[in-house]
Amino acid sequence: MKFSHSLQFNSVPEWSTKYLAYSQLKKLIYSLQKDKLYSNNKHHVVEPHDANDENLPLLADASPDDQFYISKFVAALNQELKKIDKFYISQETGLIANYNELKDDVMELENTNKATQLFNQQQQHQLQSVARNRKSKSQQRQRRFSSVSSTDSNPSLTDMSIDSAPVIHTQVSNTTNNGNSMQNLASASVSLSNSNPVYLSPFTQHRLSLKKRLISIYTQLSELKDFIELNQTGFSKICKKFDKSLNTNLKQNYLNYIKFHSHVFNPATINRIQHHITETILTYASLNKGTRRPSNTFNLDADRINNDENSSGNEEDEDGNRQEVLDFQDAERELSSHLRDHVVWERNTVWKDMMNLERKYQSAKTDNKKFSKLSSSQLRPNANITESMAMSSGGAGIIAPSTDSLTFRELMHLPPKQWLQFIMGQTSLLKFLLITSCFIALLTFNLTPFTQDSLQKNCFAILIYASLLWATETIPLFVTSLMIPLLIVVFPVIKDPITSQPMSPRDSSQFILSTMWSSVIMLLLGGFTLAAALSKYNIAKVLSTHILASAGTNPHFILLTNMFVALFVSMWVSNVAAPVLCYSIVQPLLRTLPRNCSYAKALILGIALASNIGGMSSPIASPQNIFSIGIMDPSPSWAEWFMIALPVCFICVMAIWVLLIITFPPEPNVKILQLHPSRDPFTLKQWFVTLVCIITIVLWCLSNQISGIFGEMGIISIIPIVVFFGTGLLTSDDFNNFMWTIVVLAMGGTTLGKAVSSSGLLSTMAQLIKAQVEHEPIFIIVLIFGLVILVMATFVSHTVAAMIIVPLMSEIGSNLPSGDHSRLLIVIAALLCSSAMGLPTSGFPNVTAISMIDEVGDRYLTVGTFITRGVPASLLSYAAIVTVGYGILKVMGF
């Protein structure tokens, strides 16, 4: 929610330089913040020109160390205030002059209307006297004259659109004292109305002209009012940012100061503008209805539109007041339609921030594909000779277009060498064709030990095909997940549980599609909803800031505190979203660090690695946990998961913290900014969101005890979704911003697991592996498979590794001679998937960390930084899981 964006889109374009220079003041705040951190404040003395007599009250409550920075900032604020005040006075002066001129014209129109009605009454009286003598003829004459007279006396009968009406600049003047002029005006109206019924009388034209001028005045008054409010909001927000950054209390004092030391922000000024706006609406309502207004139209107060308590007993007065209110609302609505739309900025959810970060990262990436480097002259035999000469002349030439513009006919005429260059440049296509060839070979030839059962043979081919596509990311991960149901139905895999015969394509499709939407998916959406609500209403950030504010300024302790905050946030908003939130919290700290500072690297890497560890901490902390819990039977309760995961997470974070301190030695000249908690009290919405989140988490923790009411945890997840989206706290845009690629990825993994289990392939593979390890102790099995899982999860995503390995671990563990240890192996596998963090692509936190850049656009981290710290961190976590985690699981009877 950036005010600079609101200022940009809601300001009047012609006045863009006259608004508060919000961005420049932000830069000044950051400069003063850094100066305060690295300078000896005791040597700063407030100079007389920095603090005049008017500014002294603003410095009264400040400490001597802060007075220098407050005086510098106040001087910049006063300069902006003077600029805004001067511009406003110049605009107000001209606008009020136009307003008064319009006031006189409206009063003149009212006087003209009165004189016209008086003239019509006199004419009617004369016609009535003549009618007594010539009754038949006078009746016809009276009807004709009455028709014309009513048209003139009630201009609303010739109502038409303001925009389509002609603009008449002729002013009707001196009509009150000149009876001949009024007689001529009425006579002209009569004759012209009879000869041309669509002709507008001068009176009506003048009324429409006044309505146009009222629209213009209303628009300018509204823009002037918005100018005041927008700048007032800007001063409030920039002072709040200054107080937050330098730990001062300037905001309230300065806002009170500008009310009495400027014309633009004086309450009387704002009331005057609002009064003029209300009177303009009242006058427009009168002209719009064509009714007669009293001569003091512009002296009426806005309260006139409300019901008068003194006339409550008179029904006619009440009806009249009610009609005036309706007329006022209609006029206000019509006038407001001519205003520009006001853009309101809401705080983003963490999922929207992730989309923006990914979009920024994707737009910054350069196209590394080789075929894009081929010039047009290389691919096209008839390339433009001018382009070839430009490229060969040693000049810059024209950048060659990519092969996206290459036609099929041109491709067919390429020489063999250029054909080869073109084909070799399509790396993704080549990988896809190679993997697809392997898939076809597995389907066609007997290359596997599963040839005796065609269903298992097909399922193994699909498993290898999907695993290779996931591992290489030849196509997007979610696209591979969507391919799985198609392959399962086309190549028979699903076995009827009763007859053990292959299901028909119709039954197979119904079964496999029904497995895609499960309790796992609902639990995932429930976690996304909690993360969206906690981030949109700033709750997670406020709580995290309060924790970090108590960390002091010791670099080592701040690093450890940030890592535990990342762990804590990951528990409730998932480790997919936690890094984005944590990096926004430490942004002020990173801004004050020198360039290429090793502590900045340690801080960013520490948050990423701790977020990976945080993926173990709760059932909703990561997609792999949700997927693993869905396979376990019975599923562990939240309390059981916490008892297993939290001790392991604590040990892993402490070990990684020591690793970062050793590999990133502290720099003596680096000073750490003291973070300050938010001073804003919790609103009712924030308390409501917090209460709903707590209730949801408590119900999840008690899911086994209340399974007779809610069934599975996925049903409980519907509660926050209905509450937050049903009440409007979250919108449909927030729902659209969910990480749907992760949801589809989880669907694909669930579908593949069902297929592998239904075909019997999982049982056959487990029997083959069990024959090799069944005589080994369970601890040795954990060590062996733990390394395999760690390596696989390092090179593919954590979620994909879990979807491939966890079903196999479940089947192997359930058939061991020592007993059913499937739940133990599943939990170990899930924890190890989160502990793989050796590469920038190993997990969502690492991807977020590698995309972090400083203020000049340089990346904080490199691939080498991840490998040299991530691999040892993975091994330390592996050791903690297979020892401490294994021991806790054995004690708990898993």
Curated annotation (Swiss-Prot):
PTM statement from Swiss-Prot or TrEMBL: Ubiquitinated by RSP5. RSP5-mediated ubiquitination initiates internalization and degradation by the endocytic pathway.
Entry-annotated residues carrying Phosphoserine: S295, S311, S312
Membrane topology: Multi-pass membrane protein
Pfam families (UniProt xref): CitMHS, SPX
Biased composition (Basic residues): 132-144
Residues annotated as domain SPX: 1-256
Gene Ontology BP term (one): glycerol-3-phosphate transmembrane transport
Keywords: Membrane, Phosphate transport, Phosphoprotein, Transmembrane, Transmembrane helix, Transport, Ubl conjugation, Vacuole
Transmembrane annotation, as ranges: 430-450, 474-494, 511-531, 557-577, 602-622, 642-662, 682-702, 706-726, 738-758, 777-797, 799-819, 824-844, 874-894
Subcellular localization(s) per the UniProt record: Vacuole membrane
Segments of skewed composition (Polar residues): 151-160
Single GO term (MF): glycerol-3-phosphate transmembrane transporter activity
GO cellular component: fungal-type vacuole membrane; plasma membrane; vacuole-mitochondrion membrane contact site
Coiled-coil intervals, chain numbering: none
Annotated stretches, region: Disordered: 124-160, 293-321
Induction info: Expression is constitutive and independent of inorganic phosphate concentration and PHO4 activity.
Family: Belongs to the CitM (TC 2.A.11) transporter family.
Biological function: Vacuolar phosphate transporter that probably exports phosphate from the vacuolar lumen to the cytosol.
Miscellaneous field: Present with 4280 molecules/cell in log phase SD medium.
Protein's name in the database: Low-affinity phosphate transporter PHO91
Organism of derivation: Saccharomyces cerevisiae (strain ATCC 204508 / S288c) (Baker's yeast)
Gene: PHO91
